[in-house]
């Protein structure tokens, strides 16, 4: 089972991306939101689920573990396969999906192509009590991964700009300790500013 893929983004299409890892190009199906965060030629990491059928092996990729877990949870509902689960996550982001299921919001769920009123009712009945548990465990795991991923990206960017790895790591750790919620771009600018003062 392939749990995640990390490498250079070779291609981005409407419904998938190709990511090269260890010389192999993996085609990973993903939602528009996930694909929108990728950039051709840049490194990316996606959490993946592999669906194996008699005639195919398909990878589905997600930017966080919460989306990945919701994708798996959706497929426990009778009549929901990988395509419909992906369509659901394409229309409803994790928070909106959790709310719709918890509150029994059939209108929100039926906005997904392929989900009618009966299907939406079935989803609510089967998932209402399970969806919060997924969010709690996935949220905790996701935070740790995102934090380390941001750190790695900043250190690599600073190394690419010619800073020694030790200095890059110290500056990055200092910035993230002071502003743990900072985005990658903000943290990178702060680290560059810090390194500029010490040069």
From Swiss-Prot:
CDD domains: UBA_RuvA_C. Its main location: cytoplasm. Residues 141-145 are annotated as: Flexible linker. InterPro entries: DNA_helicase_Holl-junc_RuvA_I, NA-bd_OB-fold, RuvA, RuvA_2-like, RuvA_C, RuvA_C_sf. Residues 64-141 are annotated as: Domain II. GO terms for molecular function: ATP binding; four-way junction DNA binding; four-way junction helicase activity. Homotetramer. Forms an RuvA(8)-RuvB(12)-Holliday junction (HJ) complex. HJ DNA is sandwiched between 2 RuvA tetramers; dsDNA enters through RuvA and exits via RuvB. An RuvB hexamer assembles on each DNA strand where it exits the tetramer. Each RuvB hexamer is contacted by two RuvA subunits (via domain III) on 2 adjacent RuvB subunits; this complex drives branch migration. In the full resolvosome a probable DNA-RuvA(4)-RuvB(12)-RuvC(2) complex forms which resolves the HJ. Residues 1-63 are annotated as: Domain I. Gene3D superfamilies: 5' to 3' exonuclease, C-terminal subdomain, DNA helicase RuvA subunit, C-terminal domain, Nucleic acid-binding proteins. Belongs to the RuvA family. SUPFAM superfamilies: DNA helicase RuvA subunit, C-terminal domain, Nucleic acid-binding proteins, RuvA domain 2-like. It comes from Rhodococcus erythropolis (strain PR4 / NBRC 100887). Residues 146-199 are annotated as: Domain III. Has three domains with a flexible linker between the domains II and III and assumes an 'L' shape. Domain III is highly mobile and contacts RuvB. It is found in: Cytoplasm. GO terms for cellular component: cytoplasm; Holliday junction helicase complex; Holliday junction resolvase complex. The keyword DNA damage applies. Keywords: Cytoplasm, DNA damage, DNA recombination, DNA repair, DNA-binding. GO terms for biological process: DNA recombination; DNA repair. Disulfide bonds: none annotated. It comes from the Bacteria. This is Holliday junction branch migration complex subunit RuvA. The RuvA-RuvB-RuvC complex processes Holliday junction (HJ) DNA during genetic recombination and DNA repair, while the RuvA-RuvB complex plays an important role in the rescue of blocked DNA replication forks via replication fork reversal (RFR). RuvA specifically binds to HJ cruciform DNA, conferring on it an open structure. The RuvB hexamer acts as an ATP-dependent pump, pulling dsDNA into and through the RuvAB complex. HJ branch migration allows RuvC to scan DNA until it finds its consensus sequence, where it cleaves and resolves the cruciform DNA. It holds the Pfam family RuvA_C. The lineage of its organism: Bacteria, Bacillati, Actinomycetota, Actinomycetes, Mycobacteriales.
